[in-house]
């Protein structure tokens, strides 16, 4: 799905506040920027064919073996790699509404949707709803499918307990997806990784393209893992701000801000469509939200927002209130 993702900032010239991406925009990346400026000569040579040095660092951090980790060019790269590798299984089940790339990747490789499909795709925490499925319920899904893929890209944006890599590497049918893009707020670098049993990782490597991770992304990834600083230094406060924002939006007539266990959540607007609200906010206030109508199972009235700073959140509520009242 090239079109239809959030964070379509490139379509607009005047955006000052971006609620469209689920990533927090206030992260200070100046130290990373300075480091990368010292590593620009890395582009003169080919990078490692398989990002092995970064995989070793991630394995150490997770308490697992390097042969149980596969670094990819973002979580989406992993999604298509998994769909390609297991394409002969033929059937899949996707828990909806959720991230569209599971559906698109399965369509590309000829899967048929079936409730008891061989592959089961789960986003946990779920995009776009912000729901979190308990770990025991996730593992129960693994009992009903040949392979369970759990996308934990937003694991750093919730305090709810989730599966850890060490919980799944001993299982022969569970894959976890992780997003360094989300963890460190670096979407332009395209970095993610898979954790699973060594047998699953070995099978994925058979379809893995060489030099999938460019030299600067590899340098950045190692620098970020070594320092271990995530995008949100005070997650409880950030999630409390999310609930404050939800409460304010629920006071606006015609707006319903749905429950969430993450920093992002769905809203519905009764009076108009999400697409119209999005265009109004973008052109009149320089605010970008996510029209969520293209998620399977949602309606033209659904939109998604991700919490930003208190001042930006107040500005968003005021702008939506102005639209509703006028």
Residue ranges and their predicted role:
Residues 28-31, 50, 173-251, 256-258:
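PLP-dependent aminotransferase class I/II
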Residues 107, 114-161:
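Active-site phosphate-binding strand-loop segment of PLP-dependent enzymes
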Residues 1-45:
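N-terminal "arm"/small-domain region of PLP-dependent enzymes with the aminotransferase-like
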Residues 73, 85-107, 112:
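Conserved PLP-anchoring active-site segment centered on the Schiff-base-forming lysine
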Residues 283-284, 297-326:
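PLP-dependent enzyme catalytic core of the Aspartate aminotransferase-like
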Residues 30, 272-279, 311-315:
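Short, conserved charged micro-motifs
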Residues 239, 252-285:
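Conserved PLP-binding catalytic core of the aspartate aminotransferase-like
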Residues 51-55, 65-89:
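Conserved beta-loop-alpha segment that forms the PLP phosphate-binding cup at the N-terminus of a helix
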């Amino acid at each position: 799905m090239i079109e239809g993702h959030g964070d379509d900032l490139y379509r607009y010239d005047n955006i000052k506040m971006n609620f469209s991406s689920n990533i927090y925009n206030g992260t200070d990346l100046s130290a990373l920027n300075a480091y990368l400026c010292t590593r620009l000569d890395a582009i003169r040579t080919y990078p490692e064919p398989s990002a092995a040095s970064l995989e070793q660092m991630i394995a150490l951090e997770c308490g697992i073996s390097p042969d149980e980790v596969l670094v990819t060019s973002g979580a989406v790269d992993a999604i298509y790699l998994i769909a390609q590798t297991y394409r002969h299984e033929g059937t899949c089940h996707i828990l909806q509404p959720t991230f569209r790339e599971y559906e698109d990747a399965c369509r590309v490789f000829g899967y048929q949707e079936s409730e008891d499909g061989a592959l089961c795709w789960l986003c946990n925490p779920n995009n776009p709803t912000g729901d979190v499925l308990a770990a025991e319920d996730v593992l129960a899904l693994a009992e009903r499918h040949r392979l369970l893929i759990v996308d934990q890209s937003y694991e750093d944006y919730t305090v709810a307990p989730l599966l850890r890599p060490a919980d799944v590497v001993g299982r022969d049918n569970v894959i976890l997806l992780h997003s360094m893009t989300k963890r460190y707020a670096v979407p332009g670098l395209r970095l993610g990784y898979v954790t699973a049993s060594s047998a699953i990782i070995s099978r994925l490597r058979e379809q893995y393209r060489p030099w999938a991770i460019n030299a600067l992304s590899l340098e950045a990834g190692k620098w970020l893992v070594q320092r271990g600083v995530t995008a949100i230094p005070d997650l409880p406060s950030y999630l409390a701000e999310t609930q404050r924002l939800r409460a304010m939006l629920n006071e606006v007539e015609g707006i319903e801000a749905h429950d969430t266990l993450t920093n992002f959540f769905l809203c519905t607007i009764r009076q108009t469509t999400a697409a119209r609200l999005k265009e109004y906010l973008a052109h009149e206030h320089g605010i970008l939200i996510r029209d969520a109508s293209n998620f399977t199972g949602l309606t033209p009235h659904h939109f998604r927002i991700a919490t930003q700073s208190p001042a930006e959140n107040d500005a968003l509520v005021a702008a939506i209130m102005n639209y509703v009242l006028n």
